Amino acid sequence: MKSPARCVRVALAAALLAGLALSSAACAKEEPPPVSVLGPWTGDEEESFEKVLALFESEYDIKVDYEGTISRRETLLAQVQADSPPDIAILPSLGELAEYAHEGELVPLPEAVRERSPAPWSPELAVDDRTHTYWTPVKIDLKSVVWHYPQRPATKGDWCLGMGSDATSGWPGSDWIEDILLQQAGPGVYEDWATGALSWQHEDVRTAWETWGRIVTAGGRSQAREALANDFEAEDGRGLLKPPPAAGCTREHQGSFIRRLYGSKVRFAATADAVPELANDNRAFEVSGDMAAMFRDSPEARKLLTFLTGKAARTAWVAGVKERNRPFFPVSAGTYGEAWGNRSVDRALRGATRLCVDASDAMPPNLVEAFHRAVLEYLDYLGSPKGRKSPLDSLLEQLELERGRQHKSGAPYVPSVCGTP
């Protein structure tokens, strides 16, 4: 028979062990879950971004789960509808982010991040009578430029042009029309149009479409047909602009991201300098960006956003990629090596008088889809035999009706898209 004292000792030991087990379990639960990030980068770009995230994990002892996808809109929408959004999502569409903000899905940026979020990429939004900034550019790109190989003289009308881009086919054409409007009518008209205040049937908008039509068909109507058949990166994924001595088109209107396909031998000029029809002294450029927004608030997510917009992350990102893949930021990283294109893009970004976010990136998604469809229909007309009636009046009317539907439904527009460097 066990003594009462021994029973008490056994009971105390068991209680102590149970307490230690509970304490250990509680400590184990204190480890935060990984910060989930949904972004646009896959392949080599994903590997480069993962290196930046690895530095964050090492510095802060916080794990990050990154998911890269080219179907970012569909993936993010499905996750939000399933009530399981990522902690942070990175995407180029201000229009989509504005919708999420007005639906109450986004968390306002922390103060430290907001201070690093300049115009035109991060406008303030009024949501429920309170004004906040909801997204910040992680990296940016320059548009309003034309690329060429110096060894090959430009041939009139010989433009590299491809509309194919899966679910977003048509955007290279919308980029052209946006840039033409910016160069012809100036930042004020451009901003009114991009923010929903200017009719699609306005004379300046119509003129931009007609100018693009003349540019596309200057080398013959077959160029429009080829544009409909081509992917924007070409069938081989190496770009439409081929180096000498290969034959083919001689100029390409495209954003600075296209450097990754062409390397250091390709050169660019501002659209206003490269396209005689668009000559002006505005020094205004279209830009785009990959914006980070917080869908679920946590100290860890805030730390990651702060890190991604800071100098250490940007320096590591630049150092960890090939010259042709080097990213650009709202504030110059100052380390662009010897590549002519990298230094020149950075100088253009800092030397512009006005920078205006890609208009279709700022518009409501339904209107953007209609814009892309209209581009493809207009190209189909441009590539058809002469004698067919232009559909432009009808296309602009349809786009104006869609603008009206967006206003009637209360779809949010961003309040501004232009700013100074």
Regions found by a protein language model. Give the residues of each.
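Secretory targeting and sorting signals
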Residues: 2-29
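Early extracytoplasmic/lumenal segment of secretory-pathway proteins
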Residues: 32-103, 119-121, 385
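Short helix-initiation/N-cap motifs at beta->coil->alpha
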Residues: 68-76, 225-242
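Hinge/lid segment of periplasmic solute-binding proteins
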Residues: 94-144
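Extracytoplasmic/periplasmic solute-binding protein
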Residues: 136-138, 155-206
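Glycine-centered hinge/linker elements that transmit conformational signals in sensory
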Residues: 194-233
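Extracytoplasmic/periplasmic substrate-recognition and gating elements
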Residues: 263-327
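Conserved C-terminal helix/tail region of periplasmic/extracytoplasmic solute-binding proteins
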Residues: 347-421
